[in-house]
UniProtKB/Swiss-Prot annotation:
Its EC number is 3.1.1.4. Its cofactor is Ca(2+). Keywords: Calcium, Disulfide bond, Hemostasis impairing toxin, Hydrolase, Lipid degradation, Lipid metabolism, Metal-binding, Platelet aggregation inhibiting toxin, Secreted, Signal, Toxin. GO terms for biological process: arachidonate secretion; lipid catabolic process; phospholipid metabolic process. InterPro entries: PLipase_A2, PLipase_A2_Asp_AS, PLipase_A2_dom, PLipase_A2_dom_sf, PLipase_A2_His_AS. The lineage of its organism: Eukaryota, Metazoa, Chordata, Craniata, Vertebrata. Snake venom phospholipase A2 (PLA2) that inhibits collagen-induced platelet aggregation. PLA2 catalyzes the calcium-dependent hydrolysis of the 2-acyl groups in 3-sn-phosphoglycerides. This is Basic phospholipase A2 S2-22. Binds 1 Ca(2+) ion.
Amino acid sequence: MYPAHLLVLLAVCVSLLGASDIPPQPLNLVQFSNMIQCANHGRRPTSNYMDYGCYCGKGGSGTPVDELDRCCKIHDDCYGEAEKSQKCAPYWTWYTWKCGSDGPQCDDSKTGCQRFVCDCDATAAKCFAKAPYNKENYNIKTRCQ
């Protein structure tokens, strides 16, 4: 084998090892984002929910600060139930749904994890659409204990 080939092979191996440390993006967050847009008819960007209150976004602790934050806590709890009782990986579960006139609708033919996770997301998206958005509750994680 030529030294140049060995260098290329070594570079590929090193890059693959480095890439294994990068956590992949959960697949169904794209679906959840689309559901949120469906439910609120595009009135509020999905990014507004990424760091809202004590429960919207990654993790959660303390007491929900308002109705919208309660929607996020309920969604977190629903995902916890999906993991516990359904043995699902909710962040990785891909499901089918459609955007109807009354918001997101899960595919009735699905059962088990797909249906459970879809219902978690659809319920949360509809809850988000109904709840008022208080700008003062954006990026307040330091207040959540």
